[in-house]
From Swiss-Prot:
It comes from Bacillus cereus (strain AH187). Pathway: Isoprenoid biosynthesis; isopentenyl diphosphate biosynthesis via DXP pathway; isopentenyl diphosphate from 1-deoxy-D-xylulose 5-phosphate: step 5/6. The lineage of its organism: Bacteria, Bacillati, Bacillota, Bacilli, Bacillales. Converts 2C-methyl-D-erythritol 2,4-cyclodiphosphate (ME-2,4cPP) into 1-hydroxy-2-methyl-2-(E)-butenyl 4-diphosphate. Its EC number is 1.17.7.3. GO terms for biological process: isopentenyl diphosphate biosynthetic process, methylerythritol 4-phosphate pathway; terpenoid biosynthetic process. Keywords: 4Fe-4S, Iron, Iron-sulfur, Isoprene biosynthesis, Metal-binding, Oxidoreductase. The gene is ispG. This is 4-hydroxy-3-methylbut-2-en-1-yl diphosphate synthase (flavodoxin). It is an enzyme of class 1 (oxidoreductase). [4Fe-4S] cluster binds at C268, C271, C303, E310.
Length: 370
C-alpha cells in the first residue's frame, strides 16, 4: 500500500466485517444487475463478483419483494451487502430488519423528518452505516436554482445538507459519494468534499459508459482523484457484466500501489522481433492470475534479449524466443524451457510463489495477533 496516495485522516466506518476509511486499504464495490427478488440469480451473480475480488456488493431495493429477499441473500454470501433505497423509507427499514450491512439513501428524498429518523434509529440500533449518495444529475431544486447548473460547490452543499440531517439525529456512521458523469466535475467535487468533511468517500464516475469507453473514462477520473490521496472505497460503473467492473477496479488500484491482495501482469506491447504468440499467451496468463489474492508480479515478454532486464521487478516471468523461452525470477534467468511447455512451466512457478506469499502473509497475521 502506498501511504503517499492514501487518505489517512478519514473517519473509520464499519461495514459488515470490513472497515472503510481510517488508514485501511480502499475497498472495491460493485452492484448486481439481477432483479433482487430473484434470490437464486442474485446470489449466483454475487458469488461471481466475490470470486473476481469484489469486497462489498450493492443491490437495488425498489419494492417490497426486493426488501424481503435481503435475509435469504445474506445467508448465502460472504461479503457485506448494501441496499440501494430511494423514496420509500419503509424499504430501508425492511432491508435493515433483513440484516443488510449498509444502506444507501438520500435523506432529502426519503421524506419528512420522522421517516428519516425511523431509518436512522434502525440503522443506529443495528450498527449499520448510511451512504449519502450525491449525484450531479439529481441535485435539489434549490441548489440548481442557486448555482444555475450542477457544480462542485453545489454538490458539496448538498452533501453537507444531508450530513447535517443525520448529525442532528446523532448519527455519524456516514459514507458519502459525489458522483457525476462529467470527469472534471467529479474530480473537483471530490477534492472539495475531502476538504469539507472527514467522512469516508465512495468514489465513482456515474453513467461512464460501455466496457471500453467506461473503463477509459473511469480510469481518467478516478485515477486523478486517487493520485491526490482521496477516496476510501470505489465502484467502476460500466454498462457491462459487473465482474468487469471489479477487474477494472483491481487494475486501477494496482496501478497506484493501493492493492496488496492482487496479482499484476507485465507484458510488452509487441513488435516485429517477436517469435511467439505473445498476445494470446499474455491473455491466458492474465486470466490465470486474475483471482490470486497475493501481490505477485508476473511478466510475459517477447524478447529474450531485453526481456529479463525490462522486468527486474517481476517475481516470475517468461521471455519468448524462437522455439523456446527463458524463465526468470527477479530479472535473473532460471532456465530455458521449450516453447510448447513454457506457459505451463510459468503457471507452476506462479503457483509455488503464490503459495509462499500466502503462507508468509498468514505467518505475519499470526505474529500480529499474538
Amino acid at each position: 500500500m502506498n501511504e503517499m496516495t492514501h487518505r489517512t485522516k478519514t473517519r473509520p466506518v464499519k461495514v459488515g466485517n470490513l472497515t472503510i476509511g481510517g488508514n485501511n486499504e480502499l475497498i472495491i464495490q460493485s452492484m448486481t444487475t439481477t432483479k433482487t427478488h430473484d434470490v437464486e440469480a442474485t446470489v449466483a451473480e454475487i458469488k461471481r463478483l466475490e470470486e473476481a475480488g469484489c469486497q462489498v456488493v450493492r443491490v437495488a431495493v425498489p419494492d417490497e419483494r426486493a426488501a424481503n429477499a435481503i435475509a435469504d441473500i445474506k445467508k448465502q454470501i460472504n461479503i457485506p451487502l448494501v441496499a440501494d433505497i430511494h423514496f420509500d423509507y419503509r424499504l430501508a427499514l425492511k432491508a435493515i430488519e433483513g440484516g443488510i450491512d449498509k444502506v444507501r439513501i438520500n435523506p432529502g428524498n426519503i421524506g419528512r423528518r420522522h421517516k428519516v429518523e425511523a431509518v436512522v434509529n434502525a440503522a443506529k440500533e443495528r450498527g449499520i452505516p448510511i451512504r449519502i449518495g450525491v449525484n450531479a444529475g439529481s441535485l435539489e431544486r434549490h441548489i440548481l436554482e442557486k448555482y444555475g447548473y450542477p457544480t462542485a460547490d453545489g454538490m458539496v452543499e448538498s452533501a453537507l445538507h444531508h450530513i447535517k440531517i443525520l448529525e442532528d439525529l446523532d448519527f455519524h456512521d456516514i459514507i458519502v459519494s459525489m458522483k457525476a458523469s462529467d470527469v472534471n466535475l467529479a474530480i473537483e467535487a471530490y477534492e472539495k468534499a475531502a476538504r469539507a468533511f472527514d467522512y469516508p468517500l465512495h468514489l465513482g464516475i456515474t453513467e461512464s459508459g460501455t466496457l471500453f469507453a467506461g473503463t477509459v473514462k473511469s480510469a481518467a477520473g478516478l485515477g486523478a482523484i486517487l493520485s491526490k490521496g482521496i477516496g476510501n472505497t470505489l465502484r467502476i460503473s460500466l454498462s457491462a457484466d459487473p465482474v468487469e467492473e471489479v477487474k477494472v477496479a483491481r487494475e486501477l488500484l494496482k496501478s497506484f500501489g493501493l492493492a496488496s491482495n492482487a496479482a499484476t501482469l507485465i507484458s510488452c506491447p509487441t513488435c516485429g522481433r517477436i517469435e511467439i504468440d505473445l498476445i494470446s499467451i499474455a491473455n491466458e496468463v492474465e486470466e490465470y492470475i486474475s483471482t490470486l489474492q497475493v501481490p505477485i508480479k508476473v511478466a510475459v515478454l517477447g524478447c529474450a534479449v531485453n526481456g529479463p532486464g525490462e522486468a527486474r521487478e517481476a517475481d516470475i516471468g517468461i521471455a519468448g524466443a524462437r522455439g523456446e523461452g527463458l524463465l526468470f525470477r527477479k530479472g535473473q534467468v532460471v532456465r530455458k524451457v521449450p516453447e510448447e511447455i513454457m506457459v505451463e512451466e510459468l503457471k507452476k512457478e506462479i503457483d509455488v510463489i503464490a503459495a509462499e506469499m500466502a503462507a508468509e502473509r498468514e505467518k505475519e497475521k499470526e505474529t500480529q495477533e499474538q
